[in-house]
């Protein structure tokens, strides 16, 4: 880790690193807003068919509605049908529900919405109800598809063109596409701009992540990565505050997008990764950047002693390794032990993200204030991640991973048997499940990095991230299965984490085990004799940088 030694000699975690981390962490607050924004911008208010005539359209409880709208088996007014002609005899007879043989028709004149909680949403803007209600979930899946495409696209581009230019571009793209989404003329254009916003989301996450960890000394990554991870958690609370103040979806979309213009402006000041510059054949530029870091950190004399020759000599081993790498994604399934790890870790990544977004993007189903439930869902991540840290450090990674997933699945399944009237119990179980899933995320980033050997570690992390994105794409679509059976979404969201938790039991434990360097060491762990009594904190330090991306 020669580059890390150079950073230590130039001030370690100095003034420059603090400013650097703060500037790269600020966008994370608003990234949470875009990820979970549809809880508010796509909220579905109470609605019913528009009735021609002089009736009070804004009155959703008036007795006159019984003469105009049929009632469902649950005793509620139909949201998608109306009588072809007013049935005033229903009022006179004081009946509780309509006759089955009365003629009805769909909402030919549109719908009337209750604007008491939401002034405007994409649902009310484009009438995404009744036969078009599935478009709500489709829009979120399209956004998550953009996140997946962005992770694939920017992952390769950042290695070729650098982290800094792509971070600048991603902030600009997030600003522009976010603004365009707010002024979309129709649903199709809205989905297109949301897809591009998702692409930009991944660009910011991946490149700001790399820029952060590649300028931070190894010994300080635990604190900085954890602090940055909590920025996303706090960002969920920022979203609640914005949504509570701004009840119009277009203005809320603007409020969450405009800050990225300021991030774009100051991102020009953030220098390129020094390590990437050296490995890309630009040691002169890297040396200049390091001298600037030394000056800001008050280590000007140490910076003046640094030369291009010293820099290249110190990093010669890393330079040679980057030029001689011959490993590919096929190595994730080529050998039996690594293949088993890849299968089990793919299941855990997919199910964690799948169930997490299945809960986090369906807040209206709990029957309580959407603002209160979002606050609770956001704050539960704080103790969940804290507890997860201690369990993974002192009990074990495998135990932590399996328990959190199984408990999350059980909590979700319990809600199937809890009546809708027991809102407090249902909410408590959902919050507990969401907290377990947040803890699972926290463990996964660490565990995955320790399971794979150094030569394919980043490839393995990429596989996990891809499976998580797939889970995020499918989660909104799985909610549509409620049309088949009302509890089917909960059954799916609950069973998959339990099955994945069981699959996680077949993964090897990595607590106190030195990080493997080669595939052979993973396949034959008995031959790995590198100080088997090493402290559990050593593998943690090597892979703690992954914690920064938790839940993002």
From Swiss-Prot:
Domain of life: Eukaryota
Pfam families listed in its UniProt record: Sugar_tr
Membrane is among the record's keywords: yes
Cell location: Cell membrane; Basolateral cell membrane; Basal cell membrane
Key word tRNA processing present: no
Side of membrane Extracellular, spans: 38-137, 185, 247-250, 357, 420-426, 481-487
Entry keyword set: Cell membrane, Membrane, Transmembrane, Transmembrane helix
Reported modifications of this chain: Glycosylated. Glycosylation is necessary for proper targeting of the transporter to the plasma membrane.
GO cellular component, one term: basolateral plasma membrane
Main location: membrane
Transmembrane segments: 17-37, 138-158, 165-184, 186-206, 226-246, 251-271, 337-356, 358-378, 399-419, 427-447, 460-480, 488-508
Membrane-side (Cytoplasmic) residue stretches: 1-16, 159-164, 207-225, 272-336, 379-398, 448-459, 509-552
Single GO molecular function: transmembrane transporter activity
SUPFAM superfamilies: MFS general substrate transporter
Membrane topology: Multi-pass membrane protein
Role, per record: Involved in the renal elimination of endogenous and exogenous organic anions. Mediates the sodium-independent uptake of p-aminohippurate (PAH), cidofovir, adefovir, 9-(2-phosphonylmethoxyethyl) guanine (PMEG), 9-(2-phosphonylmethoxyethyl) diaminopurine (PMEDAP) and edaravone sulfate. PAH uptake is inhibited by furosemide, steviol, phorbol 12-myristate 13-acetate (PMA), calcium ionophore A23187, benzylpenicillin, furosemide, indomethacin, bumetamide, losartan, probenecid, phenol red, urate, and alpha-ketoglutarate.
Family to which the UniProt record says this protein belongs: Belongs to the major facilitator (TC 2.A.1) superfamily. Organic cation transporter (TC 2.A.1.19) family.
Protein name: Solute carrier family 22 member 6-B
Species for this entry: Xenopus laevis (African clawed frog)
Lineage: Eukaryota, Metazoa, Chordata, Craniata, Vertebrata
Gene: slc22a6-b
């Amino acid at each position: 880790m020669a580059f890390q030694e150079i950073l230590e000699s130039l001030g370690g975690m100095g003034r420059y690193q603090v400013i650097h981390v703060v500037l790269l962490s600020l966008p994370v607050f608003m990234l949470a807003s875009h990820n979970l924004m549809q809880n508010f911008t796509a909220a579905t208010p109470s609605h019913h068919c528009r009735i021609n005539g002089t009736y009070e359209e804004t009155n959703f409880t008036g007795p006159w509605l019984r003469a105009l709208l049929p009632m469902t088996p649950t005793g509620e007014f139909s949201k998608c049908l109306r009588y072809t002609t007013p049935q005033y005899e229903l009022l006179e007879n004081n009946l509780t529900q309509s006759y089955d043989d009365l003629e009805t028709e769909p909402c030919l004149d549109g719908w009337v919405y209750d604007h008491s909680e939401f002034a405007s949403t994409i649902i009310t803007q484009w009438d995404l109800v009744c036969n078009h209600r599935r478009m709500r979930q489709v829009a979120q899946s399209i956004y998550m598809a953009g996140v997946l495409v962005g992770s694939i696209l920017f992952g390769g581009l950042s290695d070729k063109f650098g982290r800094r230019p792509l971070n600048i571009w991603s902030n600009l793209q997030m600003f522009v596409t976010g603004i365009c989404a707010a002024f979309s003329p129709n649903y199709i254009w809205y989905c297109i701009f949301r897809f591009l916003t998702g692409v930009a989301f991944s660009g910011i996450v991946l490149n700001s992540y790399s820029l952060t960890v590649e300028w931070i000394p190894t010994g300080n990554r635990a604190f900085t990565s954890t602090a940055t991870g909590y920025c996303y958690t706090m960002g969920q609370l920022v979203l609640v505050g914005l949504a509570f103040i701004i009840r119009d979806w277009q203005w809320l979309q603007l409020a969450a997008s405009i800050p990225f213009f300021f991030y774009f402006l100051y991102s020009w000041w953030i220098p390129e990764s020094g390590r990437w510059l050296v490995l890309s054949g630009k040691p002169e530029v890297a040396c200049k950047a390091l001298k600037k870091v030394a000056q800001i950190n008050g280590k000007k004399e140490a910076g003046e002693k640094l030369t291009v020759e010293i820099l290249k000599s110190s990093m010669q081993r890393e330079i040679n390794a980057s030029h001689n790498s011959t490993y590919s994604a096929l190595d994730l399934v080529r050998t039996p032990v690594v293949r088993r790890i890849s299968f089990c870790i793919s299941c855990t990544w997919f199910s964690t993200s799948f169930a997490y977004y299945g809960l986090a993007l369906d807040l209206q189903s709990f029957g309580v204030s959407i603002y209160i439930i979002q606050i609770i869902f956001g704050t539960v991540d704080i103790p969940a991640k804290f507890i997860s840290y201690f369990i993974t450090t002192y009990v074990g990674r495998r135990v932590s991973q399996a328990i959190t997933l199984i408990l999350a699945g059980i909590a979700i399944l319990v809600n199937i048997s809890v009546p809708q009237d027991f809102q407090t119990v249902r909410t408590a179980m959902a919050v507990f499940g969401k907290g377990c899933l947040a803890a699972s995320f926290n463990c996964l980033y660490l565990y995955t990095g320790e399971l794979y050997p150094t030569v394919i570690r980043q490839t393995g992390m990429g596989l996990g991230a891809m499976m998580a994105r797939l889970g995020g794409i499918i989660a909104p679509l799985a909610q549509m299965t409620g049309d088949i059976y009302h509890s089917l979404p909960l059954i799916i969201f609950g069973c998959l984490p339990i099955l994945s938790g069981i699959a996680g039991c077949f993964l090897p434990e990595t607590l106190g085990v030195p990080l493997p360097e080669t595939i052979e060491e993973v396949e034959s762990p008995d031959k790995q004799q590198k100080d088997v009594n090493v402290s559990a904190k050593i593998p943690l330090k090597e892979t703690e940088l992954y914690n920064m991306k938790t839940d993002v």
